[in-house]
Design a protein with these regions (language model features):
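Transmembrane helical elements of multi-pass membrane transporters/channels
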Residues: 18-37, 139, 173, 202-206, ...
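Short alpha-helical transmembrane segments in multi-pass integral membrane proteins
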Residues: 1-20, 78-143, 187-241, 297-364, ...
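Small-residue-rich hydrophobic transmembrane alpha-helices
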Residues: 50-110, 147-166, 271-335, 369-383, ...
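Helix-terminus/linker motif at the lipid-water interface of multi-pass membrane proteins
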Residues: 28, 32-50, 120-127, 183-190, ...
Length: 450
């Protein structure tokens, strides 16, 4: 038995832990990679520049989610065929997805660059930070194809049970990004432009290395394949489109929430942006566990080992409980110090209050996000996308309705008060669908996805 096949042979808790831990560490470094801009800009340029970078986050997340959703469609099929040892079909999926999605990323990058000013103005970005925010965003879109390629390749690696290589690449690019941030922002005084340029260069180098390593890895699986297959692309899109819609719609919803926050002023936005970064750090731990569950489920389904799927789900829930407890303890004891990392000395009392209140509130309820992500991961791995999409729309509807209706009337706190309720509702809808969807027999991947 190949060492690559441990997701279908080892004990579920052991297999998921071994697989998920590099992904969790990778998520941490991904956020270090993202937070480096915010921390360094906040410390060396000021809270207004921090707000400019933070104002771009909701919009850039929409485009990132397109890349992540596209990766889900390819990743589910790669895992399924890998588990079934149909390596020719697996390599056809890989080639088809890289060609198709690279073209898509170029189109989206050009669109984003051309309409950066219009999009940021539409989000009611405060006038005193608008030009810096647009500058940061345009540099981001120049490098968008690199970001897209890296995310697709990272999903490919995890789909074949390899989570250590993406971790190594993330550590490398994170360190490079921080060094270049310090040089360009603190040393050369390039401000927001320097932070964006440092990120672009680090992403580009990481994407090229990822491609070279992945192509070398594919030589291990000798089997004839097609460079492009329209039927396989349609199979990918049947899974990818609901995932793109879900992730993009949620991010668009967060853009709307951003528009609700912006009128409260630059300092409130700075505090909100600081805690959004912190929420993303802990959220991506649970996202990583959910992302680990998907290839675990897909590989075992392809191998006909359906009895292992429910055991893997329970193992993921155990990991979620452990990390939720850690998140609570860290936030409860260090929330002020964490806020200071971003806001620096010129952060006002309002910025610190917004950041601290938001951070402590979500710290109590991360367990809801954990069980939601694990359940969603199983649904994705099984290819059951409609309930997955509906559940996430319910989550978004709760967050948006409370933010839009209550925050302008009763205060900014209502932006985050509904977050745990949305997570819990999402889990309940997803779990209701999952209870009726556990597979009970061997499923041939070629029969489902051809």
């Amino acid at each position: 038995m190949s060492k690559d096949e441990y997701l279908i042979t080892d004990a579920p808790l052991k297999a998921l832990t071994v697989f998920a831990m590099p992904m969790i560490l990778g998520s941490f470094f991904q956020q270090v990679y993202n937070m480096a801009d915010s921390i360094i800009v906040g410390q060396f340029v000021g809270s207004s520049a921090l707000a400019a970078v933070g104002a771009c986050a909701a919009l850039t997340n929409v485009f990132i989610c397109v890349a992540l959703g596209a990766g889900v469609g390819a990743g589910v099929l790669v895992s399924r065929y890998f588990g079934a040892k149909e390596y020719g079909k697996m390599k056809t999926i890989v080639s088809t997805s890289l060609i198709s999605f690279l073209l898509l990323s170029i189109i989206l990058g050009v669109f984003g660059f051309c309409f950066s000013h219009a999009m940021m103005s539409g989000l009611q970005t405060p006038a005193d930070i608008l030009e810096e925010a647009v500058l940061y965003l345009r540099v981001y879109f120049v490098g968008f194809p690199f970001l897209f390629m890296y995310n697709i390749l990272s999903t490919m690696f995890t789909s074949i049970g390899e989570s250590k290589i993406p971790l190594g690449l993330l550590i490398f690019s994170s360190i490079l990004n921080i060094v270049m941030d310090l040089w360009m922002v603190a040393g050369l005084g390039l401000g927001v432009f320097g932070a964006a340029l440092a990120t672009l260069i680090a992403q580009g180098i990481s994407a090229v290395f990822s491609l070279l390593i992945f192509l070398y890895r594919m030589r291990r699986y000798q089997s004839p394949f097609q460079w492009f297959d329209g039927r396989k692309l349609r199979s990918m899109l049947r899974i990818a489109v609901p995932s793109v819609l879900q992730q993009s719609t949620v991010s668009i919803g967060m853009m709307i929430v951003q528009a609700v926050v912006n009128p409260f002023g630059t300092q409130a936005l700075a505090g909100y942006s600081a805690t959004m970064r912190v929420e993303n750090v802990f959220s991506l731990i649970f996202v990583s566990i959910g992302n680990a569950v998907s290839p675990y489920v897909s590989q075992n389904l392809g191998a006909g080992k359906t009895e292992r799927i429910k055991k893997g789900y329970h193992a993921a829930l155990v990991l979620d409980v452990c990390f939720a407890a850690v998140a609570f303890l860290v936030i409860e004891t260090l929330h002020t110090q964490i806020s200071a990392l971003f806001l620096g000395k010129d952060g006002t009392a309002l910025a610190y209050q917004v950041s601290g209140d938001y951070m402590r509130w979500i710290g109590y309820f991360f367990i809801f996000m954990g069980i939601k992500m694990a359940t969603d991961g199983v649904l994705r791995g099984l290819g059951i996308m409609r309930p997955f999409l509906i559940a996430n729309m319910v989550n978004l509807a709760i967050r948006l309705s409370v933010a839009l209706i209550c925050a302008p009337r009763f205060g900014i706190a209502f932006v985050w008060l509904a977050v745990p309720a949305g997570w819990l509702a999402n889990f309940l809808v997803s779990y209701a669908a999952l209870r009726n969807s556990w597979p009970g027999e061997k499923v041939e991947p070629s029969r489902i996805f051809s």
